[in-house]
A protein has these predicted regions:
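A short, Trp-centered hydrophobic/proline-enriched beta-strand micro-motif
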Residues: 12-29
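C-terminal motif of bacterial Sec signal peptides marking the signal peptidase cleavage site
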Residues: 2-4
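Non-transmembrane domains of secretory- and envelope-associated proteins
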Residues: 113-163
């Protein structure tokens, strides 16, 4: 007599563009934040995470390309840009464009409240990021538009994010 086992397989959708709401939970040191945000992905080209903690006003924008990460502090009109090697010297585990893209397309099970959690360590700081995705739409975005950097002052990333 043979015993059988069943394997559940989650389907990952093939897409060119992806748009979704993301509820971000951030824990750093003794502080916790819950932030509303949206993520837009142009496959293999650009990822934009827009953080709108109050009244839908964008305060921080992260733009990830295959070779670099850009963080825009919209309130103080400043930005930081770094390649992945520089970012990975500051935090562990290492971050890559592919990893971020796969995170954004993590399978959603409608009946479950699935959260994705990732811990990053930078020096003496621990940052725990929790993501809950909703309202996912595929292939609805127009061509990507990058933020115009001439409106912002370039600064070191640590002046925007306390790493």
């Amino acid at each position: 007599m043979l015993a059988s086992c069943s394997v559940s397989r989650q389907t990952v959708t093939r897409y060119q563009t992806l748009s979704q709401r993301v509820q971000l939970g951030l824990k750093m040191d003794q502080h916790e934040y819950n932030l509303s945000s949206s993520a837009r992905v142009w496959r293999d080209e650009l990822i934009v995470l827009s953080v709108q903690p109050m009244l839908g006003i964008e305060m921080v924008r992260l733009e990830a390309t295959p070779d670099s990460i850009w963080v825009f502090d919209k309130m103080n009109r400043r930005y930081a840009a770094m390649d992945y090697a520089s970012v990975n010297r500051m935090i562990q585990p290492n971050v890559s464009f592919r990893m971020l893209q796969e995170l954004c397309n993590h399978p959603i099970t409608p009946k479950k409240k699935e959260n994705i959690e990732q811990e990053f360590v930078s020096g003496k700081h621990r940052l725990i990021v929790t993501c809950k995705f909703s309202n996912r739409e595929y292939n609805t975005l127009q061509a990507p538009a990058r933020t115009k950097v001439n409106k912002y002052k370039q600064v070191d990333l640590r002046t925007i994010l306390p790493l």
